[in-house]
């Protein structure tokens, strides 16, 4: 507690006495010998008796007659009015020395402070030469530091400094007790102000990946034109016979161009439709105007209550309790609504029974507990208050999104399998088909697929670790609908499941990644090993069949574990993505290999000896 004293100015005998806001005993003018000492205090004289105190009952303060205590006068150096704030520490010493002469009370609770303070004098530390030089330099320059404004005793920092915790001790002599009281009541001491940043609504904007798609298409068109352009065949001597190499029969370039262009147009249409369609369903949209109407009624009642609270606050001059929202205010709001309903019923007596019941339902208000109740009862009442405010449509959506399903472990296992295997299955299929279309051997295709899998494994482990370390985000309500309150959104629980089983999730996801990533290269390497015509085409078709089967199964599992079980939409999306990506990669690989062979940039054919 910070002790504060009532100001009682006293007259001076010589005219040069000190006038402060805390002391009631003021000493006479000092002698010239005492002026050489900096803020020194003489405590050698004895304390006087308390019999001659005169209590001022009207002002609630006590004044002490200066003439009655001539024996206990304290010698203090007289100072000008401009340097009065520098004598704060000496005043504190005088107050603590003569505690029986002052009326000390607590500014927060208003009770008297009856305990005495015992002080122990500690020897001052020895000043070094460097410190003396610094003091001399400061005095020569006429500057004073913050600690040199007053001569602080050695025991001041341990005992008295917590009582005066203001930052500017040399400038402010007394701590503002009113500010401390308000901060303690609000409970914000030592806390940084929190800033609630709400995200703006997503506005439709032109996606950036469209530019990448157009760039790839432009590059493919240039490559196709360069391949299809007529160029003179390379000169081959007639007596040389090059070894015949089996060529892979591929469809014409015009047919291959139709597949990626149609796929890109399809993806463009789907993305544009999903981009500009409303987020929420019609059921949620229908509840919004009702909630806004109820909100407007609550705002009107809240404004009337604020005017009433301001009038009462001016009378009492006390801090009013801060309610979290307008729904948690006392029952004055219910009284106003009930009077409005009675007036409407008196004006329109011919209303139907259905309308009356609807008005009663819309104006139902919960019963709020009194401030004298126990906190446990208040918590129960608040929980019962929030239950009737939920919209009727929210209950139908809770079982699919929030409530745990039966067999939650199976769902989490499926989520982990889908997370690790679905994307890698598509990536591995594209890698194998592009390598096969470029004319690589079976061994090279197998090695390339396994190498791609090893590099993707590190990226998958890194993404899993980032997902585990990601903290839950606060979901704020950006719309006007109050039925969707604020909550925490954990992305890990949505993707994989509960955080308690994170190790199991990682093991299953990594194993799924490895298994589904190895299927395309292994099928290509170990299928149709006998020499036959069109063996490479059969290998590619086998890879397509097995990979599409895996993608179909994983997409069905993804639709099963999602909140909205759209099997057809999910299946169509992933199968279309897989076929489009693999066809596009195969087309690009074939064009690049043919262009490099015809241009002569790279030739790996064995050298033949001339005859």
Curated annotation (Swiss-Prot):
Compositional bias (Basic and acidic residues): 283-300, 307-316, 339-361
Feature: compositional bias, Pro residues: 1-10
Protein name: Membrane protein of ER body 1
Assembly mode: Interacts directly or indirectly with NAI2.
Keywords: Endoplasmic reticulum, Membrane, Transmembrane, Transmembrane helix
Induction field: Induced by NAI1.
Residue ranges with Polar residues bias: 11-23, 42-71, 387-399
Subcellular location: Endoplasmic reticulum membrane
GO molecular function, a single term: iron ion transmembrane transporter activity
Region (Disordered): 1-71, 127-149, 283-375, 387-406, 470-492
Topology in the lipid bilayer: Multi-pass membrane protein
GO cellular component, one term: endoplasmic reticulum membrane
Family listed: Belongs to the CCC1 family.
Description of the deletion phenotype: No visible phenotype and no effect on pathogen sensitivity.
Described function: May sequester excess cytosolic iron and manganese into endoplasmic reticulum to reduce metal ion toxicity. Not essential for the accumulation of ER body components, including PYK10.
Biased segments, Acidic residues type: 480-492
